[in-house]
């Protein structure tokens, strides 16, 4: 069983504490843009026939449900997250959806995915890779469980490239967002969000990490002026 580091345990506890308000806060803080980002990311999977998709850091299951809505009924989806509180809420959401028979959710960390080599046709992780303490280990695990030719799609916050937009973005993330989030939930959780985004590697460095673990044809797509980025690679 994979043992989380002290930092990993703190991150898990933090997300567990905000789980009941997680979806609402994300909608409010992003003005709903995160839904469009998720739809764009899922389209990059490009799975048109039968298959199996893994959604890592699934949270309360939003991406797993989006995958189900965009793929044929012959596609099954497994979502994993290291936060039990998120999985518990996600299971309720999935059960109440029209895709309940296609989605299963399990508690598991990205660094130790409990499936055999070559188990999935595609893997996704949205707004989760920056929370993985050992990112190389997490990327290696996702590469391991993919079949040959399988695709990985990663959606993550980034830093805008336009100078003026970047200044506004930093002001919002560093000054406004933590206060809004703190009004609804633990302040520390929404101070962690901007800190973790600003600490995340640059696009080129992160693509290099994906290549390092074996992914090929690694590309990225900037969304909404570079506020978010989708990374795509193939095993």
From Swiss-Prot:
CDD domains: AdoMet_MTases
Catalytic reaction(s) noted: a 2-demethylmenaquinol + S-adenosyl-L-methionine = a menaquinol + S-adenosyl-L-homocysteine + H(+); a 2-methoxy-6-(all-trans-polyprenyl)benzene-1,4-diol + S-adenosyl-L-methionine = a 5-methoxy-2-methyl-3-(all-trans-polyprenyl)benzene-1,4-diol + S-adenosyl-L-homocysteine + H(+)
Keyword terms of this UniProt record: Menaquinone biosynthesis, Methyltransferase, S-adenosyl-L-methionine, Transferase, Ubiquinone biosynthesis
Pathway given in the UniProt record: Quinol/quinone metabolism; menaquinone biosynthesis; menaquinol from 1,4-dihydroxy-2-naphthoate: step 2/2; Cofactor biosynthesis; ubiquinone biosynthesis
Residues binding S-adenosyl-L-methionine: 60, 81, 126
SUPFAM superfamilies: S-adenosyl-L-methionine-dependent methyltransferases (SSF53335)
Keyword Translocase among UniProt keywords: no
The UniProt record lists the keyword Transferase: yes
Gene Ontology molecular function: 2-methoxy-6-polyprenyl-1,4-benzoquinol methyltransferase activity; demethylmenaquinone methyltransferase activity
Enzyme class (EC, first level): transferase
EC number(s) from the headed UniProt entry: 2.1.1.163, 2.1.1.201
InterPro entries: SAM-dependent_MTases_sf, UbiE/COQ5_MeTrFase, UbiE/COQ5_MeTrFase_CS
Example GO BP: methylation
HAMAP family: MenG_UbiE_methyltr
PANTHER family in alphabetical order: 2-METHOXY-6-POLYPRENYL-1,4-BENZOQUINOL METHYLASE, MITOCHONDRIAL, METHYLTRANSFERASE
Function: Methyltransferase required for the conversion of demethylmenaquinol (DMKH2) to menaquinol (MKH2) and the conversion of 2-polyprenyl-6-methoxy-1,4-benzoquinol (DDMQH2) to 2-polyprenyl-3-methyl-6-methoxy-1,4-benzoquinol (DMQH2).
Family in the record: Belongs to the class I-like SAM-binding methyltransferase superfamily. MenG/UbiE family.
Name of the protein in its database record: Ubiquinone/menaquinone biosynthesis C-methyltransferase UbiE
Encoding gene (name): ubiE
